[in-house]
Amino acid sequence: MKKNLYKYLAGNDYPGRGIVLGKSPDGQKAFVAYWIMGRSANSRNRVFEPIDGGIRTVAADPAKLEDPHLIIYNAVLTLRETTVVTNGDQTDTIARFMNGNLFPGYSFEAALATRTYEDDAPNFTPRISGVVDMRRGGYKLSIVKSDEGNAESVQRQTFDYPQPVAGEGHFISTYVKNGAPIPSFTGEPLRVAIDTNDADKFADKLWASLNEDNKVSLFVRSIELETGEYEDIILNKYTACLLYTSPS
């Protein structure tokens, strides 16, 4: 049974970072959503910034950045006909493996086999990642996490959806809910309804569902499967303090 993603998020004040991959009800588009949340001032001091083919996280106010470790990274990259989305610098690891075609058909899994969970004890935040075929619409999701907080045991799980159904998607997040330490996501990605063909409406509903205090930024990509062309939407809670330099 498909879950109502908006209700699920509205009832959870801190699922952490989240990825949704799926297909529009008319079957013509693939949707990619990624958001970040934060409880600390350092985690909240971020915005999504567009780059060629994707986004990266940057400090909203560089003067207030305490520690870039784990919070500043490329979150979305486009590799020919593949969108890569992750919650950390494993985006670059996946891109390197896929660009080199090091393990044909399994470069995603092979790349993540070289990575482990984040070193933020006692939470040991999972690394969540996804890839989308921008012409066929198939996708994969992965989570790399500790064994319920046991730093001596890493678990790597990949979920493959080569034939997604129209109006359906899958959702994975770093955490189950708030806590101390924060419990990692468990089980398979949640099967959720994609209820609109309109990316703007999808983004607006997701943004409204995320906890007002803890949400930081949201990214939504709509991909036309017939052509592979895409449009990106970025919503930031905080305004970036941009540093301009004069031309040389």
What residues fall within each predicted segment?
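Conserved loop->alpha-helix
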Residues: 35, 40-81, 91-92, 97
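Short, extreme N-terminal leader segments that mark the start of a protein/domain
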Residues: 1-24
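Conserved small/polar residues in nucleotide/adenosyl-binding loops
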Residues: 244-248
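Short beta-strand scaffold segments in enzyme catalytic cores
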Residues: 16-24, 30-33, 74-76, 127-133, ...
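Charged, amphipathic alpha-helical segments
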Residues: 1-5, 102-119, 196-208
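Short histidine
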Residues: 90-151
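A two-mode feature
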Residues: 124-127, 132, 138-243
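Active-site-proximal beta-strand elements of phosphoester/diester hydrolases
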Residues: 84-87
